[in-house]
């Protein structure tokens, strides 16, 4: 009977969102599960964002064709007007916006202005190979202007890293548009091993163009190994992190990446192991991705009368589609849709904790804006996530007190990331500000809460945990990168702040802040990062529940092969 009471009490702790931060932290299974799922999703988002930014690193095509003009003269031309043929890609509005010719004494300057305006209308729509050809005057004395709008005759220069069929689908025989050409180049250059440039050559047919691609390809594989003490007290401080990626493994301009994070201290009694796999493939303006992650943990928790073994695992699989619906040399706007299935299993001394072990399926719709600004980059992502009943997702469990989690929740998330370089006192500084927030009217399962005290949120927390259904945090970092002989040295300071609120918690909004300072030293492919951080909770804690977070010293060493 005593065992049953202890177990029911534990289940209640896991299932109720109105607990205080420290009460939740005392039994950290749900924290481990949430951290594992959110860390793997963060790794996936960072890879996608990195590939998107990589597209804007390379200069896109910039072509300004020179129109064929008549030799300038002040004399009147022996014509009474003009007629235009061959136009199919311009609208009536485009044609009506052209400057009218004079009724009397048409000069070469008037004709040249008309040709330039026609060429400019094509360029405004992105048709970069359109040109105007002169025809002999007709029987009415009208000079002919014939628009050769141009089309793609063929594409040359593809290699294993540049699959022209997927990068430029259905482009052959179509009008050559700058946006289509830029999009294909951007998709090719999203792979770090590619540096693709393009030349447009005249084809053998009238109006035909040959797209000739050149690629300065580097090594397609990348391997990064790191060791740090960013782990948790319960499951292990020191971790070995490995990231391996390969560009175009199937010759489809595709991408595959594998991450593995494993704790190393006392692996037989306490551990946290996480693995994430991502695969993506382009098709014109679309990028399709599939991903999966698996993590497992184990640690021992001291209770009042005994020590228990807590362990569990999480599995996450999903598919995602991104579509770049607007782009230029300085910005990309993307729509994305993602379907994710999550399975969480938590155990208390071989007894499964059903209320903290849900199966969830979510569908997420988002819009992303990536903008290169003067001396900086701004990225914003807004998304709506809805839990659905697909793939065996569980129904919302019945809770007698009515304070249970909603397994059919809806939540809104906003993420912004701003990098800005600026000069001060004849030195260059870098400022980075990151905001993440979420809101849900529903009571979320614990794995969907927003946590302020994770290492990727407010810096400086080690023992306290603070999370909730709604909230947000802001991370600000000011750094000063400089070179010393062959070393790149970057000292930094950071200030973070955030608040969360749990549904049903009478305490309302609870917050915290963190202060940090760090130093990054890089020599060729090796990096050493040191950070000192201190976090504080900004709400009243009772003496029995009070947690004092010590000042943290974090160390990370990494090497890129």
Swiss-Prot record:
Domain comment? Probably a beta-barrel protein.
User: What sections of the sequence does the record tag as coiled-coil?
Assistant: none
Q: Which UniProt keywords apply?
A: Cell outer membrane, Cytolysis, Hemolysis, Ion transport, Membrane, Porin, Protein transport, Signal, Transmembrane, Transmembrane beta strand, Transport
Q: Which family does it belong to?
A: Belongs to the TPS (TC 1.B.20) family.
Q: What is this protein called?
A: Hemolysin transporter protein HpmB
State its location(s): Cell outer membrane
Q: Which GO terms describe its molecular function?
A: porin activity; protein transmembrane transporter activity
Q: Set out the biological process GO terms recorded for this chain's protein.
A: killing of cells of another organism; monoatomic ion transport; protein secretion by the type V secretion system
Q: Which domain of life is it from?
A: Bacteria
Is Transmembrane set as a keyword in this record? yes
> Cross-referenced InterPro entries, in alphabetical order?
Hemolysn_activator_HlyB_C, Polypept-transport_assoc_ShlB, POTRA, ShlB_POTRA, TPS, TPS_OM_transporter
- Please tell me where this protein is predominantly located: membrane
**What exactly does this protein do?**
Interacts with the cell-bound hemolysin. Necessary for the extracellular secretion and activation of the hemolysin. Probable member of a two partner secretion pathway (TPS) in which it mediates the secretion of hemolysin.
Q: Which residues form the POTRA domain?
A: 77-150
Leader sequence segment: 1-17
GO-annotated cellular components: cell outer membrane; pore complex; type V protein secretion system complex
Under the heading PANTHER family, the entry gives:
OUTER MEMBRANE TRANSPORTER CDIB (PTHR34597:SF3), SLR1661 PROTEIN (PTHR34597)
Matching Pfam families, A to Z?
POTRA_2, POTRA_3, ShlB
């Amino acid at each position: 009977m005593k065992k049953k009471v202890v177990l029911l009490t534990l289940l209640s702790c896991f299932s109720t969102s109105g607990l205080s931060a420290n009460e939740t932290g005392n039994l950290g299974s749900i924290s481990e599960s949430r951290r594992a799922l959110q860390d793997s999703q963060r790794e996936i988002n960072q890879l996608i964002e990195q590939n998107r930014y990589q597209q804007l690193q390379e200069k896109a095509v910039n072509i300004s064709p020179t129109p064929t003009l008549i030799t300038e003269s002040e004399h009147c031309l022996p014509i009474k007007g003009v007629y235009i043929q061959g136009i199919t890609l311009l609208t009536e509005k485009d044609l009506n916006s052209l400057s009218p010719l004079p009724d009397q004494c048409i000069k070469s300057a008037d004709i040249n202005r008309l040709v330039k305006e026609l060429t400019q209308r094509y360029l405004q729509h992105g048709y970069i190979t359109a040109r105007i050809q002169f025809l002999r005057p007709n029987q009415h004395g009208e000079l002919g202007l014939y628009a050769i709008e141009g089309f793609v005759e063929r594409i040359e220069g593809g290699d294993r890293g540049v699959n022209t069929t997927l990068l430029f689908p259905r482009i052959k025989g179509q009008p050559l548009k700058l946006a289509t050409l830029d999009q294909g180049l951007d998709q090719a250059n999203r792979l770090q091993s590619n540096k693709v440039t393009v030349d447009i050559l005249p084809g053998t047919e009238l109006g035909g163009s040959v797209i000739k691609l050149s690629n300065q390809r580097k090594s397609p594989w990348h391997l990064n190994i790191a060791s740090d003490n960013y782990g948790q007290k319960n499951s292990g401080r020191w971790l070995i992190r490995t990231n391996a990626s390969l560009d175009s493994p199937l010759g489809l301009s595709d991408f595959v990446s594998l991450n593995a994070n494993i704790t190393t201290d006392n692996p037989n009694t306490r551990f946290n192991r996480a693995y994430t796999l991502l695969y993506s493939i382009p098709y014109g303006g679309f990028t399709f991705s599939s991903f999966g992650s698996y993590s497992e943990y184990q640690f021992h928790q001291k209770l009042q009368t005994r020590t228990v073994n807590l362990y569990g695992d999480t599995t996450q699989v999903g598919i995602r589609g991104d579509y770049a619906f607007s782009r230029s040399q300085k910005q990309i706007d993307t729509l994305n849709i993602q379907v994710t299935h999550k399975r969480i299993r938590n155990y208390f001394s071989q007894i499964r904790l059903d209320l903290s072990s849900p199966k969830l399926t979510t569908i997420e719709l988002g819009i992303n804006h990536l903008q290169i600004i003067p001396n900086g980059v701004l990225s914003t992502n807004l998304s709506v996530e809805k839990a659905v009943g697909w793939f065996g997702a569980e129904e919302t469990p019945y809770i007698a007190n009515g304070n249970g989690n909603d397994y059919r929740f809806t939540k809104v998330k906003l993420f912004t990331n701003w990098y800005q370089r600026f000069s001060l006192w004849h030195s260059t500084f870098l400022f980075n500000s990151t905001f993440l927030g979420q809101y849900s009217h529903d009571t979320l399962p614990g794995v969907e809460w927003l946590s302020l005290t994770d290492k990727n949120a407010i810096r400086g927390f080690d023992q306290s945990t603070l999370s909730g259904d709604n909230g947000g945090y802001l991370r600000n970092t000011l750094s000063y990168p400089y070179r010393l002989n062959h070393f790149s040295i970057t000292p930094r300071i950071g200030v973070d702040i955030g608040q969360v609120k749990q549904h049903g918690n009478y305490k309302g909004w609870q917050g915290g802040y963190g202060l940090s300072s760090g130093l990054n030293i890089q020599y060729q492919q090796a990096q050493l990062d040191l950070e000192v951080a201190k976090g504080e909770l900004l709400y009243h804690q009772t003496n029995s529940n009070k947690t004092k977070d010590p000042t943290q010293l974090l160390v990370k060493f990494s090497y890129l092969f």
